[in-house]
Amino acid sequence: IIFNDDQIDHTTGLLMLREGCPHQIYCTKEVNEELNTTFPLMKMLKHWDGGGTFWHEIIPNSTTNFEIPVMPSYEFYAHSLISNAPPYSAYRDKPRKGDNIGVTVVNKKTGKRLFYLPGLGVLEEHILEEMAKADILLLEGTLWTNDEMIKGNFSKKLGTEMGHIPLNGEEGLIKVLDTLEKPRKILIHINNTNPILDESTLEYKELISHGIEISYDGMSIEI
């Protein structure tokens, strides 16, 4: 199990897997710290068979890969992302380098690369370079516009304040994805407020016209 961050919606599922303990958890030291203190999932799971979880540290931006023994045909690389820490965290609005990561998965046999980015607040140069090398991009499509949550009276914050670059606009992700010729582009982490979820909308049709896909439950991806 790889945790890219310690957001509640990304980590709470571990509790549903409690009867399968112990689990091998791969995450940064920053995420592990939060999951043992302010959101203590790791401590809670110690009460189940096998001692709960075993932590393996991920070091972002390392020049060497990390491997997972049960997946010997693949190697993994972690990249720090500028996004945000969870609302419960003391590091909210002042995230550390290891609070959010993207992960590249490489098939050793084919050389194909998948880059997984569930939260993007800023597009740094090292992230753009990695995106350009990927064969498949799985990246966040949380919001269509930056003020979507404000206009819908769901929040008082812009998407970028929450750590999410919107899809639309001059500085949106669509503009960036249009510059990348190599990868297949698939959106994940799509908020319920995002109009692209409705196939009858102009926003959905515009997205598809740019060659960008929307992920779905049960989707199978090979590299």
Spans of model-derived segments:
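Acidic/polar short surface loop at catalytic or gating sites that assists cofactor/ion binding
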Residues: 21-24, 31-66, 82
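Short, charged/polar "capping" segments at the starts of alpha-helices
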Residues: 31-36, 64, 146, 193-197, ...
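Generic structural signal for residues in well-ordered beta-strands
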Residues: 52-55, 76, 212
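Active-site metal-binding motif and surrounding structural segment of the metallo-beta-lactamase
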Residues: 1-27
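Cap/insert and terminal regions of metallo-dependent hydrolase folds
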Residues: 98-100, 108-113, 120-219
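Short internal beta-strands
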Residues: 23-31, 138, 187-188
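Core dinuclear metal-dependent hydrolase active-site scaffold
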Residues: 57-130, 217-223
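Hydrophobic packing residues within well-ordered alpha-helices of enzyme cores
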Residues: 11-17, 35-38, 127
